[in-house]
A protein has these predicted regions:
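Short, surface-exposed, polar/charged, turn-prone segments marking secondary-structure boundaries
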Residues: 42, 51, 74, 83-87, ...
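Short, thiol/selenol-centered motifs that function as redox-active sites or metal-ligating centers
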Residues: 60-67
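Alpha-helical support elements that line or immediately flank enzyme active sites
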Residues: 69-81
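Structured beta-strand/loop patches that form or line metal/cofactor-binding pockets in enzymes
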Residues: 13-60
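C-terminal binding/interaction regions
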Residues: 1-21, 30, 80-156
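Functionally engaged cysteine thiol sites
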Residues: 37, 63, 125
Length: 156
């Protein structure tokens, strides 16, 4: 039954979204929308000098599953690297599509959405936050790379 998807933990994560809002001066912003249901996540980030997420905020308008995914992402994002986020996204996709175990380490909490695998129409809404975070970090890294090249060229 689809009601089994909405456990107390999922509803708790959905109701207590960490780091809600927007950053005033993000280095990267990612937005993802689940076309089927309209769930949407906008994520803003800044990075530290080692390309780890230094600050993070999210504006999420989603169903309980999308909100729950965003809740886990909000708890885990600070300090994460692009590689960690990408691995978590890939592991989550494998969990939903092909029976994988799901993310580990800092994003292990996304495993709470494992039973969403049985409901393909809910996959995209469960993914909006991690996908938006990945896009935001990719954008911020490109900006950091451009700024580094500009500083090097200016020093020459």
């Amino acid at each position: 039954m689809i009601d089994d998807l909405y456990s107390a933990r999922i509803l708790s994560l959905a109701a207590n979204l960490p780091r809600a809002g927007r950053l005033s001066a993000p280095e990267g912003t990612g937005e993802k929308i689940a076309k089927l249901c309209g769930s949407r996540a906008i994520v803003d980030v800044t990075l530290d000098d080692q390309a780890r997420v230094k600050d993070f905020a999210q504006d999420v308008k989603a169903c309980a599953l999308g909100q729950a995914g965003a809740g886990v992402v909000g708890e885990a994002a600070i300090g994460s690297t692009f590689a960690e986020i990408e691995a978590a996204r890939d592991a989550m996709l494998a969990m939903l599509k092909s029976g994988g175990n799901g993310p580990d380490n800092r994003f292990e909490g996304l495993r709470i959405l494992k039973q969403v695998a049985d409901y393909p129409a809910r996959h995209a809404s469960s993914m909006v936050a991690i996908e938006a975070l990945l896009e935001a970090v990719r954008q911020a890294m490109a900006k950091h790379h451009t700024n580094t090249r500009t500083r090097i060229a200016g020093a020459a």
